[in-house]
Each structure stands twice: as C-alpha cells, then as structure tokens.
Regions:
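An N-terminal assembly and electron-transfer interface module characteristic of large anaerobic redox
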Residues: 1-133
Length: 133
C-alpha cells in the first residue's frame, strides 16, 4: 500500500517497487499528477488488478481498518489499512535518487520489523504537534 502523501510521485514509486518484485496492491491518491499520466497508463496495462482509492471521500473515514499484516508506505496508507507496519515519512522527506531509494528500502525493512502505533503518530500529526515526525 502506498499513499500520495509519502512521495510527490506515488505512481512512479509503485512502478519501481512492482518491477523489482514487490507486491503493491493499492495506491491511495486523489488525482493523477499530469507528470505521472504515462506511468498511470502503464500501471493500468501492466497491473490491471492494482486498485486506486481516494483519500478525500468522507466514507473512507468509516471503512474498517483491519489489514494488520501489510506494509504501508505513508501515513494515510497506514491509517486506512490499520497496519502497525508503516514508513512514516511525508513528501519524500528530501530523499532523492539512488541514495533515496536505498534509504526508503531500509525504512521499509525497519517498518516491517518494528511496529508503530498509527493512531498515536497520525492523530498527533493532526493536532499539529512538532514531535510527530
């Protein structure tokens, strides 16, 4: 699971992960960035089972959050799935290029091995506290 708050180009991230053997089943995003339109079309053709979920629809807040054994990349993906295994970064956190990919891979391993409490971290973020990230 990937969400659009994790990185400015979530579809490119999904493509990178999928083409390197990772399982990506859902992307949370509200619109397709024009810069990612070709990637979106490629994903639709190559991975027709990939689902796209909006984050701004009110009914998303009421959905059951019971997907505990998944790795979420981004806070919204963590919130909507209910998993405690998530990478807690926003807007790429300045990670760029090969070194950024390498660091994200390390954060993915860490997120799978060490649980976090999404309700504590994400709700604190919503209150505007500085210590959430």
């Amino acid at each position: 699971m990937i969400d659009h708050t994790f990185h400015p180009r979530p579809l490119e991230l999904a493509k990178l992960l999928l083409t390197h053997g990772f399982s990506v089943t859902r992307i949370y995003l509200d619109a397709v960035n024009p810069e990612e339109k070709a990637t979106f079309e490629w994903l639709k053709q190559q991975y027709p089972g990939l689902s796209y979920e909006p984050t701004i629809h009110p009914e998303m807040r009421m959905r059951p959050r019971k997907e505990e054994n998944v790795l979420a990349i981004g806070q919204k993906a963590a919130w909507f799935t209910g998993t405690k295994h998530f990478v807690n970064l926003v807007e790429g956190a300045g990670l760029y290029g090969f070194d950024g990919i390498r660091k994200v891979a390390g954060l993915m391993i860490e997120a799978w091995q060490e649980e976090k409490d999404p309700e504590d971290l994400i709700i604190r973020k919503g209150w505007g506290c500085e210590s959430c990230i």
